[in-house]
Amino acid sequence: RSQGREQRAELSGEGWLRLGATLGLRAAPTVLVLDLANAETDSADALCRAIEARGLACAALFSRWGGASRQALEQLPALLAPAQPAALVVMQDFVVGAADGREAVSAALTRLNVPVFKAIRLTERSQTQWRLSSDGLPADSVQYRVALPELQGIGQPHVISALGPAQRDAATGLALRRPQALPAEIQRLAS
């Protein structure tokens, strides 16, 4: 997203270099939100809207986990030109770039030299369950949501979405619970 226009792209393969100009990004400091291409996009979009409401440009970048994420971060300045990265918000869990690309991504983040924040999509608990819990995050998720990202300098974890209400799928009859953005938490992270 940039200047109120939808600015998203799925990153995969080699054809996405110099995407910033294609998306109409300006030569200005830009906050980047990195998420998975196969995840819900409402949370990343809501975060970009909140950042833009504060007068900063924002772009949501969606890539596959592993090699595509490593490539995106290694080439981020060229990818987003003419925009200049000002901060990065990572919504991916585990380590960006997977085990094979962890060190390369860590080096790319060091070269970027921008603050890197961790946004958490809580898929096990609703907003109410999360707020009433004694532990915040389920203990078995702290490793991949907080500890592993911290190995790469991705810190200040912040929950920005939680499990939404059950909705019946018309085709299968299954009750599906998708993540739902938490507006107050998104505003906190954006500030």
Regions found by a protein language model. Give the residues of each.
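An N-terminal assembly and electron-transfer interface module characteristic of large anaerobic redox
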Residues: 1-191
